[in-house]
Every structure is written in structure tokens, then in C-alpha cells.
Amino acid sequence: MVTSAVRRANRGADRLKWIMALFMVLAATPLSAKSGPTTIDSPSHLVSVTVTTDEEGHATYSIKRGDAPVVAPSKLGFLLTDAPQIFRNLEIVRVLNSQHDESWEQPWGEWRSIRNKYRELKVFLREKSPLRRELTVVFRVFDDGVGFRYEFPEQPNLKQVNIAEELTQFAIAEPATAWWAPAFESNREEYLYNRTPIAEIGIAQTPLTLKTTSGLYISLHEAALVDYSGMNIAKVTGGLLKAVLTPSAIGPKVSRAAPFPTPWRVLMIATSAPALYMANPLILNLNEPNKLGDVSWVHPRKFVGIWWGMHLDRQSWASGPKHGATNAYARQMIDFAAANGFTGLLVEGWNKGWDGDWFANGEDFSFTQAYDDFDLKAVTDYGRKKGVALIGHHETSANAAHYESQMDAAFALDHSLGIDSVKTGYVSDAGGFKVLAADGRIVYDWHEGQASARHHLKVVETAARYHIAIDAHEPIKDTGLRRTYPNWVSREGQRGMEYNAWGSPKNPPEHEANLIFTRMLGGPMDFTPGILSLKGRGDTDILSTAAKQLALYVVIYSPIQMVADLPENYAKYPELVRFIRDVPTDWADTRVLNGEIGNYATIVRKDRHSEDWFLGSVTDERARTLVVSLDFLTPGKHYIAEIYRDGADADFRTEKRHSTVVEHRAVGSTDTMALALAPGGGQAIRFKLKK
């Protein structure tokens, strides 16, 4: 029954929405044609963008933070395959200003609520040449960065847009240090980060992180990569960088019919590394709102897996005497998960196609037929009784065309069995992404090209029809599309824990402190932490302390977190497993207390479903003591800090890497704590509210 009070409240809400809509219309102020510069400031006047045209008719933009230049005048435009370039002879025919302010709630994430506040400048460009082609550039200016994109309107002289290259420049205004991973190399995104002067960048993937000599931190990335080629960054000279689109084997780098927008080109700008991380909701804000509606079927969770044993070469994906995905072992893993409150089991190697050279022969995979020693229905039924959901696995060997031919049948089967999450895989060398050409041929393409962008979105949209979430490995980069498609829960996209099994080299101690301020600015990463054995293949040492493995559950964000080690290894460390059981994967709030790229970081997160906070702190190969304030705790409330810290003798280089102290301490919001981190170490803390 709806009461009169509820009706009045609803009418009030509707009236408020109408007033806000009217305000937005009135705020959109069209201006007449102008040849001089046009400037727009962020809401608090921290960041400004100026757009103009030079004497040759190049459209340029520049960015300042306060009075300090961040990006010097940089050119905009396109090189086309079958028409003259859109680069020179441009004039600004009209500009349009508007502003926007809203808060929206994530169904899952690092923050429950996100503020989306910006000022927008639309710049309408037209050629002076006889073709009179038009191009719009839209700038959204936030207090912590800028996003801009191109929009190709419908027009008679540019109906089909075939892009040979995007000519966007980023002229960084002062010398800077760059953290970057190379593009177009064989292992796709899975490279350790280079740290070089900006002038020594080769061709880099995004996100790319910069620290200028004056202390500004900048991340270059993109948002809303839809039906377009992924952007890479190349050095031109000095601090001048340019966009380089990923190539295509089936035509131009991008081919689309107008009208359409490009992805957003994004610069996050901050005065510290922690502030740079806190700016990453900007990527989400540049994406469209949720298109799926009710997504209560998407479940953040911790899960175990038939996975690490394969990477250790104790088990195999292929059938035979070492086959890992058997009914008996799956039941054993389900029992382990249920006993510890973990609600998922990933099973790799369950389906036919792994025998032989699966790396090269992705067309051999079936996504509906199991090996004889694995009964998919029986295992899912057993897990359901124990409260443990099976997580499907679809390794494609990057044969996207073959996968698409089975995708509906595979997701329909999963849905019928109650499987609500699937991990996809695209293992291949760079340039080995197999797609269908217009003439029906299978051709080799790039993991970040336009065909890949189309494929990944098709997977996510198809999965959504069957209420299935997607965790993509060897994926296309994260550009915030999880806002639009909340079933795209996580992905790999950098060196994860598996490199500590067989990598040469293994992940060094600074790797995670690099990831936090580089890769993680794009979005969640399925890093697969929690290897308490600290051993890789052949009994080799992992370059970490045990306490750091716990801290990774907090500092490397993903709404799905793997409890990646073998059950027999967890049995040796019951005190440490308690933290893994307790730590959530879904958060109401996140704060970065300290950090420097590649050196250290401390992050605290508030559980979405309780008043508890969780802290993770990690360091590189150097021991550190970091003093942190507990002012994030609720004032006047009392908490018990459950502390998991490196022992005084802990060191990733010695047999004392397991040395861990577990202790408890009463704390409140006015307290500080000194976090003593061993070389290659970390610390994890649960702040539990006293009832």
C-alpha cells in the first residue's frame, strides 16, 4: 500500500529531477563562432583546458593545473585511409558549455557511491576546404583530470570513417619519469614496468603513469573502449607523446559508419601517488550508466581453484594420469572451500580440447563437452549442496571466431546448471587473436584491436543474457565498461601470480607497488594472491613474505578474489588463513593512506556489509616503517585491530620469509600505527568494531 506521505515524497523527488534537468539545459550555453582560444575550468577551478586553432588550422588543446602547464598545446585529428586527413584547415564554428553533478551507486566496487562532477566543453570544428567536413571534440574537465573524445557527426562527405591513425598528441609540459609496459610485444600486457625518462618511452600500453619534476602525477589512459581500436602511446620527441592505435589485419585500424564517438582520452592529474589512485573513478564516470538493470545475480566472492597445481606442473589441463579436473579432486576442493566459507570453485581443464598443442589449436576446444573423468552436472550439484558455486572456464587460445560459434550453447549450459560466473582466456602470442574476416577467412589480429573490442563486448553482452559474470584473462584492457556492464567483473591484463610459478624472472618485490599506480588505475585485476607456501615450480622461492600475501587481498582490488594456493599448504598456516577467510571483496569506501610508485603503498577499505575496515600495506625490496593515522575509523567507536605483520626477522631473501606475528590491539580514530614492513614484505589488519 502506498501512503500519502510516500506519494508526496515521490512528487517531491520528481519535481527535484525536473528542476535539475531544467538547470542542466540552462547551463548549456551555446557560443557563436570564434577564432580565439576557448577555456573551460573544472568545478573547483583546479584544472583548465584551452582549445584553439593555430595559423595552419590545426585544432589544439592545452591543460593547466592552477597556473602550471600540464599539457602544452597539442594537436588533434585523424589520418584516413581513403580520404584526405582531418588535421589542418580547421576552424571552430561553435562551442557549447555545460556542467554536470550527480552521485551514483555501484552494485559492487571500491566505493559504494561515486560523485560525477565536471564541466563540459563541446567544440564544433569544420574544414575550410570544399569538403566542409565536420568533427566535434568534447572535453569533460574534472578537478582531478580531463577526458576528451571525438564525435563524427552524420554528414554527406564522410559517411564511412576509415581511420589509418589517430593524430592525438599529448605534449607533457615538463620533464617526467615514466612507468610503462611495452606494446606490441609477444606476451601482450604481461610485462614488468619500465621506469625511464619520458623521452625514452618506446611504444607503451595504457595506463601509462608519469611523475613530473615539479611533483605532478599523471596517468594517460582511455575510457569506454567500444567498437574502436585500443590506444597506445609513443614518444615523438622530448615530452611530446602521441596516440598509436592498435593495427587491424582485416582493414583500417578503425572502420565505422558515422555518426559515432571515439573512446575518451583520459589524463588523471594529482599531486601525489595516493591522490592519483583516488582519481580513478574518473574512468568510470566517462562510461555510460548500467545497461543491464538488476544485476543482483552478480556475486562478489572468494573462490578456490583447480589451477595452481597445473602451474606447478603437478597436475595437467590435458587428460591423462596428471589430469587435475576430476570428479574426485573437484569434490575435495569443494569440501575445502565450504569448510572455510569460500563460495566458488574454478575448474580449469574440465573440457575437451586440451590434449595436444592447445596453444596453437584453439579450434579443438569444446565449451560444452567434458572429459570422461569430469561430470559437470554432478560436480555442480555437489557444490550447490555445500554452498559452493562452480566457476566455468573457457580457454579459447585467442580463437575468438571459434568461441563465438559456441558461445550461446556454452552459456546456456552453464545457466542451466546454476553456473553464474565464467573465466575466459585468450592465451596466444601478440598478433595471434583469430577473428573472422568479411570473406569468411580466419585471420590473425591483435588482442587490443577493433575486432577484439567488438568480440569482448559481445561475450559480455551474451553472458549477461544468461546471468553470467565474466572474468577475462589475456583480455583487452579495462576502460571502465564495468559501469555499463556490471557483469564484467574482473580481468588479468598484467603479470599476475602465475609468473611466480614459472616466470623468468619472477615478479620482483616492487611489482605490486608498481601495479597499484599503473595497471590498477584502469580497474580490477584478477591477480590470484594468497600463495602462502611462497614456492613456485621446482620448489623455487617466491619473492614475498607471507604477510605480504595477505596484504595483496586489500591492495590489489578485485570483486572476485582467488584463494590460489593448494589446500595442503593452507593447512600449515591456520592463523594466516583466518585473515583470508575474513577479508571481504566488496567495499563501501576506499582510501590510500600513503604510497610511491614502485616503492610502497598502504590502502584501507571499508566492508560494504559491516562497520569493519581492512588495511593492506606492501613494500618493495626495502624494509620500511610507515606511520598511519586511523582517522578513517568512526569517531567515538572502539575497534580491535587484528594485525598480521612481518616478524622482526622476516625477509623475502631468506628462509625467514614466513616469519609472521599475529596480534591484537584496541584502537580508535585518534590513534596512529607504525607499520613495520620487512624487505619484500607487507602487513594486513582487520579493524573489527567492538559491539
Question: Which residues are covered by each model-predicted region?
Answer:
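Bacterial N-terminal signal peptides
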Residues: W18-T29
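N-terminal accessory beta-strand-rich subdomains and adjacent acidic, glycine-rich linkers
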Residues: K34-L292
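An acidic-aromatic substrate-binding cleft motif
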Residues: A257-N340, G344
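Carbohydrate-binding surface patches
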Residues: I597-Y639, Q683-A684
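C-terminal beta-strand-rich structural cap/linker in extracellular carbohydrate-active enzymes
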Residues: E663-K691
